[in-house]
Amino acid sequence: MDAQQGHTTTILMLPWVGYGHLLPFLELAKSLSRRKLFHIYFCSTSVSLDAIKPKLPPSISSDDSIQLVELRLPSSPELPPHLHTTNGLPSHLMPALHQAFVMAAQHFQVILQTLAPHLLIYDILQPWAPQVASSLNIPAINFSTTGASMLSRTLHPTHYPSSKFPISEFVLHNHWRAMYTTADGALTEEGHKIEETLANCLHTSCGVVLVNSFRELETKYIDYLSVLLNKKVVPVGPLVYEPNQEGEDEGYSSIKNWLDKKEPSSTVFVSFGTEYFPSKEEMEEIAYGLELSEVNFIWVLRFPQGDSTSTIEDALPKGFLERAGERAMVVKGWAPQAKILKHWSTGGLVSHCGWNSMMEGMMFGVPIIAVPMHLDQPFNAGLVEEAGVGVEAKRDSDGKIQREEVAKSIKEVVIEKTREDVRKKAREMDTKHGPTYFSRSKVSSFGRLYKINRPTTLTVGRFWSKQIKMKRE
């Protein structure tokens, strides 16, 4: 396929190299490419591209409407190419990966010069990307893979340092609030670092910012973020990977057989993402919490890359697996989360509340037991409770996970009749925003509205203004 022929508009996408960023970008790319008026260049590291190749539908692979483009990061003895991803990356190497990504700006400029796309869609962690695009007269818009709640809460103190957040209906618990803000509401040093990164990326976006969210969840935050940025903020979510090919996910057969033997909505899926590795103490509290809950569970345990010695038995309390018996299935490394959440016997998701996992839980109508760990996750956990689709397992005054709270939260969500409201609200999310929602999303009308081959900042803003108007109709 010649991307430059006819009226095809070329878009280059540059996500951060974490799964929680790659997959929403890929879903956006797939949706746009199906319009047949767009050719997508999907730019990332070699190891990241290898990870997403199996998730490309055969129809897209055959017509080459999404073309994978390698971004070469500088390698070093501590950060060889196979570690150019956050998936399983040891936490002490994360700063080196961020620095290597920044150092790839020169190679990215060569890519832009060679491909000359009509538009760049970039991620929240690359303030240098729109600068490179601007130097080549290529308009760039930001796509945030997290929600408007966290973005607006983080940016508010910078714009209005002496006033409270105006639309808050939930308050961060003491442990998390102390991490990001001082007693008078000002940002801490950690909070300032996050705010500076976000502001640099969002304010340089051409007239519009895309967010992987939807109005029924975050209307007031989306509108307030638009005020803070003085830009249109367009929700294009929920963008969640939807597996639809039989045999696509290896290892699911044994998991499905196990799930098939359980009662409807009787099982929780436990996962803390691909980037966070709970400490020994945290693992024990979570394990004992699961044991005390007396609920069936599938738990995915992940270990950092290069850790070939850790075993499931070593990571868990002595005798835990024997005591759990048939209630438990523990999987090392990876499990097909979307397929498990879709199964009729799954009744809850015990999650770190990464935005992507949270969207998946909502998309498949599964209530969430939130156990946030860091970054945007405390904000997301608060939003889960505010939306009524889950509960947060409260930590103690020192910020430590409590087994009793984990067990209590699981029981509330899965068993207790008094929290049928949570289960009902989660099911409503599935009905409104399940697997068919994004095909109905107004983003799918991109091709009908986008008329200009090489848009300027102004035309990009006008186009997305139409998207917002259609969203509200």
Curated annotation (Swiss-Prot):
Which InterPro entries does this chain map to?
UDP_glucos_trans, UDP_glycos_trans_CS
List the EC numbers from the record: 2.4.1.-
- Which UniProt keyword terms apply here? Transferase
Do the record's keywords include Transferase?
yes
Q: Which residues form the active site?
A: H21, D123
**Its catalytic activity?**
mogroside IIE + UDP-alpha-D-glucose = mogroside IIIX + UDP + H(+); mogroside III + UDP-alpha-D-glucose = siamenoside I + UDP + H(+)
The pathway noted for it is: Secondary metabolite biosynthesis; terpenoid biosynthesis
Query: What CDD domains has UniProt attached to this entry?
Result: GT1_Gtf-like
- GO biological process terms on file: carbohydrate derivative biosynthetic process
> Any further remarks?
Mogrosides, the major active constituents of S.grosvenorii fruits, are a mixture of cucurbitane-type triterpenoid glycosides that have been proven to be powerful and zero-caloric sweeteners and can hence be used as a sucrose substitute for diabetic and obese patients.
Q: What does this protein do?
A: UDP-glycosyltransferase involved in the biosynthesis of cucurbitacin and mogroside tetracyclic triterpene natural products (e.g. siamenoside I and mogrosides IV, V and VI). Cucurbitacins have cytotoxic properties and exhibit deterrent taste as a defense barrier against herbivores. Mogrosides are nonsugar highly oxygenated compounds used as high-intensity zero-calorie sweeteners; they also possess pharmacological properties such as regulating immunity, lowering blood sugar and lipid levels, protecting the liver, and acting as antioxidants and antitumor agents.
Output this protein's name. Mogroside IIIx synthase
**What organism, scientifically named, is this protein from?**
Siraitia grosvenorii (Monk's fruit)
